């Protein structure tokens, strides 16, 4: 709304809450947050939101929470121990985002195949839409509903894979309003290719990524005029060179073993200040 007068006050309150939660609620043995100071319950919803909201204060905690949640999965999906071990595709969708934010794209894809695969393939389903929720044993009931047929079989809150695959597998992310700034950060895990795209008030965004057997990557992406962003390229299992080029501009060749680029890590080469255009980034092993 353009009102920044209370920004500092709320930022301070947020930091205070984060510090208190990490001091009082983090269980270092379980690698999860407790629901409150008076219980041993470590809920699915609270822990996935700890990652998504930024309450988890280190990258290692995010990875630990992601791994601990994955250990809880049942035969039909991610159960909510705080909700009588029912499976909630709503909070399960948020769990997908949490795995993506934590950098565990493999866990994200496994949960999609497990939980949403069940919803698509079970003969009691529509085989084209997603259900509101169900018992952890696969029975199609939901707490508070006296009749089984009351469960919605076309439920908007169960559509998390759409955004999760766009944001963390294809890696098409907008960082500010309308996509004025953006990030391309593909995370294919065990997939060989991914594509995504959408349109905002500023124009069309799209990305297409293909991966070779040794981790070689070819990323083509397009962003609208007046925007800028950054590209995160996963480093392959070889000594590699990144070629980054845009239609109408001279290509750049960057050694992927060089950490001299701002924001680069052992896993990613990060190139920032990229203007809008039709770009292609290609990673090739040099030996």
Annotated model-derived regions:
Residues 1-146, 254-268, 273, 282-284:
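Catalytic cores of carbohydrate-active enzymes
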Residues 19, 106-287:
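Non-catalytic C-terminal accessory modules of carbohydrate-active enzymes
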């Amino acid at each position: 709304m353009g009102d920044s007068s209370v920004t500092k006050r709320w930022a301070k309150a947020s930091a205070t809450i984060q510090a208190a939660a990490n001091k009082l609620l983090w269980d270092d043995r379980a690698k999860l947050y407790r629901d409150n100071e008076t219980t041993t319950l470590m809920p699915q919803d609270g822990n996935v939101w700890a990652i998504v909201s930024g309450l988890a204060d280190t990258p290692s905690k995010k990875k630990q929470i992601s791994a601990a949640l994955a250990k809880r999965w049942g035969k039909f999906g991610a159960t909510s121990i705080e909700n009588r071990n029912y499976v909630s595709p709503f909070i399960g969708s948020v769990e997908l985002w949490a795995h993506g934010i934590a950098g565990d794209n493999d866990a994200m894809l496994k949960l999609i195949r497990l939980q949403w695969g069940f919803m698509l393939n079970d003969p009691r389903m529509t085989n084209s839409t997603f259900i509101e929720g169900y018992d952890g044993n696969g029975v199609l009931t939901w707490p508070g509903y006296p009749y089984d047929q009351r469960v919605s079989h076309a439920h908007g809150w169960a559509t998390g894979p759409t955004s999760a695959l766009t944001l963390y597998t294809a890696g098409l992310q907008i960082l500010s309003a309308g996509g004025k700034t953006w990030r391309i950060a593909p995370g294919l895990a065990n997939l060989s290719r991914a594509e995504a795209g959408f349109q905002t008030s500023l124009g069309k965004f799209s990305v297409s990524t293909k991966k070779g057997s040794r981790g070689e990557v070819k990323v083509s992406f397009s962003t609208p005029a007046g925007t800028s962003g950054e590209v995160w390229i996963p480093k392959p299992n070889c000594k590699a060179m990144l070629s980054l080029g845009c239609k109408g501009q001279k290509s750049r060749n960057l050694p992927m073993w060089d950490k001299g680029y701002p924001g680069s890590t052992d896993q990613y080469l990060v190139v920032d200040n990229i203007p809008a255009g039709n770009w292609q980034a290609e990673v090739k092993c040099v030996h």
